[in-house]
Structures are given as structure tokens and as C-alpha cells.
Amino acid sequence: RLAMGLSGIAWASIQVFPQPPRGTLDQILGGDRRIPVLQRGAHFYCDTRLAFEALHYDDPSVTQLGADDEALRDWAEREIFFAVFSVVSPITVLGFLARQLGLLGVVRFIRDRTHMMRNATLDVLTAEQARKAVQEFIAHLGVRLSASLYLSGKQPGYLDLCCYHPLWMACQIDRRVALPWPPIVSQWMKRMDSLGHGEVLPVTWDRAFQDIAENQSVVAGVVAEPY
């Protein structure tokens, strides 16, 4: 959603359940379970990097990062995103999920995620390891932001979105986690928040199917790694 605000575009949204089954969306995607999903005409993007590129189809370089920036993006999305769930107490996480999903929804969500992570290769951090990882990440952002308003330079960009997301999630679960963050990081978070979500319009599945029918195309060529 923040990418929409960054791009300053109008878009439409259909709400789906946090976990499968998701009815119509499952039928369209043929079983791919990741959300959010971006639709442009007949094309559906289930990878956030590809989705951001699709929003900027006239400039495919928007997600091309230097080696240091790519390492920071990978750190944010692979380690820190999961670490923020271990920084706060399990009771706080359950309370957050209950407010979002209801008690029955929490049971379904935990059962779904347990099944999904059964064959995962991620290293699960202890609470202390997670706290240390997040602290190091925040400190690194502070150093980066001392040189420019945004991680991407003078204006916010793809790298800012990637690093903002896990910290936003942490604040959604428990806003107290942000209390020890240095002011320079907190101010950056506020600037990112101020981007908003663009102009959100109502839409139905009928319109989504209409867009598919009106924008049929043939995909040619080889899909590049890692997609």
C-alpha cells in the first residue's frame, strides 16, 4: 500500500482472508498462497519486487540496487521481518492477532502457518538473538540515515519500502518496541508514514475479471532468475 502512496496513483483493493482458502483468488492464482497480490490487467504479481517493478514498468531500474543496498534489503526481508515477532512477548503477538482476526481466526492462522513452515529452511532466532538483530539493524539504519533523508537518497525508494516494512510490522504488534529507537530512525519512519496509500477506489471481483478479459496477452521469452 505504501508503494501506491510513493507512486501517487489511484488503485482498487479487494480484501481477502490472511490465510487460505481465499475462494476466487485461489482459483485465479492456481494455488499460490502469497499476499498481497498486484493485478494489472490480466497479469498478477505475487512477488513484491515484481509488483513494484510493474508499477514502474517504464523504468525497470527502480529495484536495481548496489551490492551494499541489496545486502541491506536481504537483511530486512529475510532476518529482521521474522525477528520482530520474537522481540515482543508471545502473549502480545497473540493479542495482536486476536484483535485482527478474532479468536477462531487466530486458531486457523496458527494452524496454517505451522503447516506452511513445516519444511521451511529459516533459522529461528531466540528472543535474545532477535532483539540483538533488530538493535543492530536499527543502528545500521541510523548510520545510513545520517547521510541522507532516505535510504534511497534524497527521495524515498524501493530500499526504503523494504526496510520500513518489518519495522512497521513491529510497531503494529507493540508500539513500545520503537521507544528506544534513535530519533533519526523514528523521524524516517514518520516520513515514510506520511507517504500514505494513494487514492483507494472500491472494486469487485466482476471488475477484476473484466480487466482480465480486456487485457489478454501472450507471454513470450524466458523468465529470469530468481522468478
Predicted regions and their residues:
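GST-like domain detector, emphasizing the conserved glutathione-binding G-site
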Residues: 1-108, 227
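GST-like fold's C-terminal all-alpha helical module
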Residues: 80-194, 215-216, 221-226
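Short, hydrophobic secondary-structure boundary micro-motifs
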Residues: 63-65, 153, 201
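General structural signal for secondary-structure boundaries
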Residues: 17, 101, 123-126, 203-210
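Cytosolic, positively charged, low-complexity intrinsically disordered regions immediately flanking transmembrane
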Residues: 193-214
